[in-house]
């Protein structure tokens, strides 16, 4: 008999799984009433069986046709509150509450609720004829006590149809006006399913219905990969939908604890990775208890706010086997004010018994945070910076567990505020026992209130603190602190939803697909006859700043900015596209603002409306400018800083920024970014990611970069495109190397550290003379410091800062119990505050420089492609002290700047040579070969092939520039020889 591959067989296989004992569903044999949108007999039977007294009351109040009137009351409740709310809380009729379903209790000890849950009639029906005006049927419907809640259209590639056909069917063949398809009245989720993919929507809106992918990811949920689903050796690729997601208990769990109504108009069904991460986190906590650390690497576009809200709610409502909450409080640490409102709205829709979410926002102080913790608030939202003020005022934490959810976990988690959070919440019983053993004392001999003991025992991990760190761009320190340690010593995220998957699934746009870079070519000359010695790096920065702020430079770029907006941005997103200009400084932002305005007026353009965004006041030309003074509406009124975002969204289309709105700014209409600032690492990813938000009509983005090379941007994004992990844990003993280097300066001694510690850690240190005594101890140390040379003072301060920062990191990772080192760290932290940096004589180059030559040249246009590879961090190491800024003659500094930015423009060969040098210098493979080869092998055997490839690639990008290279053999060989020798030396230095 031939194998059956029809759609009916697909439908039959799904139904068989759902109707099995494992699936938990039964087939509904009752009739469906299309006008009421209910399996009426099923609903009434459930109410009569589970709430006999309430039903008797209802019949008494409604003796004529009580069934029809009950259905009417139910429909009225759905009209008023929505079906999701009615499912969770029921509805009231004449003072009596009627429940239409019961959910599984959190605690297994709650037998009564468990029995009620078992009385639900959870049904699955094939070929659901939903209308009395058409003969159309939906392939499958799932109902709770006669109320249709989820529906499926199934397609089969073997019969020539896919999920795309199912989408069309939902959009064009299903009337949203039908009772069963009205928003939040019956069906809460519309699914399109084929053999390989699942898509879903929560609102039918004809051709405007928005379907989202509901797939696991190409390597499975929570794993590194792209869009789609992994192979399933045991059946269909999409079997997770009916075997896991819509298994009876799972489906009821989603209705009770995941689905939410936001803004009263958007019904949220969790995406697969969100459902997966929350359930895996809860399962791990149930298995291991408190004290674990979890790193969740979820990209922009992952719905991180909802994931945090669901995680917070589930952790706050999690009970142990003794029917007690696992966590005394769940504390969400965030700097995003939008998360406050979203968490409160989402959680209040789940459970009215948890109490209000305590948001300790800008309008509240640290005392409010202390009170919320001491009063046992179930969910608290706060910033990290409020903990240092109250960490000693939190009541006894022994025996209490806390869950700390960190929104956008970065290196701030290695600082003082993070340590104070731990000090406030930690149950130090185990740490005290460990400390006593190391000291060779009985536990009762150790005073837990001793200041030094309290600080030492707050370090490292604690059995009562669970950390859940969410971030799209984990740094090495973040992985070390929160990542899961593998047997080989590497640290990995607990769960991953990668940037690659978010892009491939269409939740964010790839901001690197349309990227254009320019190089700024200029030559600067000095206008004075003398040639003074100046600090090289400071002078170089000033000269570079001179070029950046030069009126000619800004005028040329302003023209490109305006014309790019008019030619590209203004035509995007249905004519609503917007642009952001990222400048290098507040002064640059002010000057760009004026120059762009001038150019717009000069050209007579009326379609470019600009705003500026920066903090504080900026003096320029004797006038002080603020954001509010520059930003003016069409009616002449000034725009307050708090209104800039709103005005940009509604009435303006170009925003010029300086260190503002580069992170956390969510404007979906932002299409184009002009970059005139050096961007590196996480900062580059966060800044450019302002463009990646999606909205109807937005299909691409555009970046024009005046400063950064395409390769630099690729290197910034690559580590976060897929999974990021730390190859090896930190060597905590490296801190002793820094300590030894500090001591070599002989600025302070053990006696100084001990004298300071005696004052700092004494129990009465809060008396009025404590600060005076501490500063008295530090005074002779400062005197010895001041006797050092300027270069030595610079080195010492760098090392001092390094030790304090390094110790803060190490004490988060490990509990060292090194009293002497801890004392020295506290001593160094206060000494650092006392030692002022050396007075730096101002460099005045005003009137001493002039711009001789300037040219903007396009160097790259196209897509910056990222590899399908994981990002790897080497172990975190300490930063050594940097050398003092040497002085060089002004002529020499200008020569170096001109060389770096191709100042000798009369010689075309020099441009060619420099371009090839830059391309080859950026080749990591070539660098590795240079470091492992002798000069002859490198120049004769290795380099020629690399040079030829670079020359050909360069020719393809700029034929006019590089054609002469292939026309003159002697020139080709001369340049290749010169570069081979030069680059070999450069590579060997690294």
Regions inferred by a protein language model and the residue ranges of each:
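ATP-dependent helicase/translocase motor core
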Residues: 2-329, 338-354, 385, 399-401, ...
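Conserved C-terminal RecA-like helicase domain
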Residues: 544-655
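Post-DEXD/H (motif II) to motif III coupling segment of the RecA-like Helicase ATP-binding lobe
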Residues: 414-511, 521
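Interdomain helical connector at the RecA1-RecA2 junction of SF1/SF2 helicase-like NTPases
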Residues: 226-238, 242, 477-576, 593
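Conserved segment of the helicase C-terminal RecA-like domain
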Residues: 690-719
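Conserved RecA-like ASCE ATPase "motif II neighborhood" in helicase/translocase motors
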Residues: 370, 376-408, 412-423, 430, ...
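Catalytic cores and motor modules of nucleic-acid processing enzymes
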Residues: 25, 39, 48-51, 56-69, ...
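A short beta-strand element within the Helicase C-terminal
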Residues: 654-657, 662-686, 701-705
């Amino acid at each position: 008999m031939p194998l059956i591959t029809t759609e009916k067989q697909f439908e039959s296989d799904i139904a068989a799984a759902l109707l099995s004992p494992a699936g938990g569903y039964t087939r509904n044999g009752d009739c469906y009433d299309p006008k009421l949108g209910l399996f009426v007999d099923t609903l009434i039977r459930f109410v009569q069986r589970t709430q006999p007294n309430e039903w008797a009351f209802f019949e008494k109040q409604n003796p004529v046709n009580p069934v029809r009137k009950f259905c009417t009351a139910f429909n009225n409740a759905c009209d008023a509150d929505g079906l999701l709310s009615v499912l969770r809380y029921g509805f009231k009729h004449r003072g009596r509450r009627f429940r239409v379903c019961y959910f599984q209790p959190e605690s297994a000890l709650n037998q009564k609720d468990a029995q009620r849950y078992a009385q639900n009639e959870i049904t699955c029906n094939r070929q659901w004829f939903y209308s009395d005006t058409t003969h159309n049927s939906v392939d499958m419907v799932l109902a709770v006590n006669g109320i249709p809640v989820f529906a499926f259209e199934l397609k089969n590639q073997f019969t020539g149809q896919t999920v795309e056909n199912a989408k069309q069917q939902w959009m064009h063949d299903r009337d949203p006006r039908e009772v069963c398809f009205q928003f939040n009245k019956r069906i809460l989720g519309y699914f399109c399913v084929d053999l390989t993919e699942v898509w879903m929507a929560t609102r039918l809106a004809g051709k405007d219905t928005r379907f989202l992918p509901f797939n696991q990811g190409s390597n499975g949920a929570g794993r590194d990969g792209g869009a789609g689903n992994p192979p399933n050796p045991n059946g269909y690729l999409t079997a997770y939908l009916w075997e896991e997601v819509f298994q009876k208990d799972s489906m009821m769990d989603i209705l009770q604890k995941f689905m939410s109504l936001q803004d009263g108009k958007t019904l949220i069904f969790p995406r697969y990775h969100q459902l997966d991460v929350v359930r895996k986190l809860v399962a791990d906590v149930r298995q291991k208890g408190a004290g674990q650390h979890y790193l969740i690497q979820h990209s922009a576009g992952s719905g991180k706010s909802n994931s945090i809200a669901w995680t917070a709610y589930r952790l706050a409502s999690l009970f142990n086997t003794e029917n007690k909450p696992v966590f005394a409080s769940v504390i969400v640490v965030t700097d995003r004010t939008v998360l406050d409102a979203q968490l409160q709205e989402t959680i209040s829709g789940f459970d009215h018994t948890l109490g209000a979410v305590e948001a300790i926002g800008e309008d509240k102080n640290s005392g409010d945070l202390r009170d919320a913790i001491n009063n046992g608030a179930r969910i608290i939202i706060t910033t990290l910076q409020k903990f240092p003020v109250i960490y000693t005022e939190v009541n006894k934490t022994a025996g209490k567990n806390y869950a700390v959810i960190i929104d956008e976990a970065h290196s701030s988690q290695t600082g003082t505020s993070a340590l104070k959070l731990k000090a406030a919440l930690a149950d130090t019983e185990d740490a005290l026992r460990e400390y006593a053993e190391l000291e060779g004392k009985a536990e009762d001999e150790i005073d837990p209130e001793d200041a030094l003991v309290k600080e030492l025992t707050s370090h490292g991990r604690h059995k009562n603190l669970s950390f859940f760190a969410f971030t799209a761009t984990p740094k090495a320190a973040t992985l070390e602190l929160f990542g899961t340690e593998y047997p080989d010593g590497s640290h990995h995220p607990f769960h991953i939803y990668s940037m690659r998957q978010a892009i491939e699934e269409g939740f964010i746009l790839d901001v690197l697909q349309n990227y254009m870079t320019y190089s700024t070519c200029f030559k600067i000359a000095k206008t004075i006859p003398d040639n003074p010695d100046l600090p090289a790096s400071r002078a170089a920065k000033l000269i570079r700043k001179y070029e950046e702020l030069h009126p000619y430079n800004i005028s040329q770029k302003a023209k490109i900015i305006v014309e790019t907006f008019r030619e590209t941005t203004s035509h995007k997103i249905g004519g609503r596209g917007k642009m952001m200009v990222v400048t290098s400084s507040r002064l640059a932002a002010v000057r760009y603002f004026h120059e762009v305005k001038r150019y717009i007026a000069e050209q007579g353009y009326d379609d470019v409306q600009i705003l500026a965004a920066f903090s504080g006041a900026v003096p320029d030309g004797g006038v002080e400018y603020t954001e509010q003074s520059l930003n003016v509406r069409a009616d002449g009124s000034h725009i307050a800083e708090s209104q800039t975002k709103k005005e940009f969204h509604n009435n303006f289309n170009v925003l010029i920024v300086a260190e503002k709105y580069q992170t956390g700014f969510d404007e979906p209409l932002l299409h184009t970014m002009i970059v005139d600032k050096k961007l590196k690492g996480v900062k580059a990813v966060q800044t450019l990611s302002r463009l990646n938000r999606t909205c109807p009509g937005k299909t691409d983005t555009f970046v024009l970069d005046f400063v950064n090379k395409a390769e630099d941007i690729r290197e910034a994004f690559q580590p976060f495109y897929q999974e990021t992990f730390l190859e090896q844990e930190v060597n905590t003993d490296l801190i002793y190397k820094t300590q030894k280097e500090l001591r070599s300066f002989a600025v302070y001694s053990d006696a100084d550290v001990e004298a300071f510690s005696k004052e700092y850690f004494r129990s009465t240190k809060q008396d009025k003379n404590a600060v005076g005594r501490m500063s008295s101890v530090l005074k002779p140390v400062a005197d010895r410091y001041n006797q050092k040379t300027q270069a030595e003072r610079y080195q010492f301060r760098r090392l001092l800062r390094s030790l304090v920062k390094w110790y803060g990191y190490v004490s988060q990772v490990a509990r060292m119990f090194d009293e002497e080192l801890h004392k020295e760290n506290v001593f160094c932290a206060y000494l650092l505050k006392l030692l002022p940096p050396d007075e730096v004589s101002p460099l005045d180059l005003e009137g001493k420089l002039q711009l001789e030559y300037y040219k903007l040249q396009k160097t790259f246009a196209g897509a910056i492609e990222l590899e399908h590879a994981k990002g790897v961090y080497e172990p975190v190491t300490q930063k050594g002290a940097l050398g003092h800024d040497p002085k060089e003659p002004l002529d020499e500094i200008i020569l170096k700047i001109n060389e770096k930015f191709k100042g000798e423009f009369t010689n075309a060969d020099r441009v060619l040579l420099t371009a090839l040098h830059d391309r080859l210098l950026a080749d990591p493979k070539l660098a590795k070969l240079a470091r492992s080869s002798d000069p002859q092998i490198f120049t004769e055997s290795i380099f020629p092939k690399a040079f030829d490839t670079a020359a050909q690639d360069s020719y393809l990008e700029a034929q006019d520039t590089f054609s002469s290279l292939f026309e003159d053999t002697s020139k080709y060989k001369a340049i290749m020889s010169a570069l081979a020798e030069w680059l070999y030396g450069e590579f060997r230095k690294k």
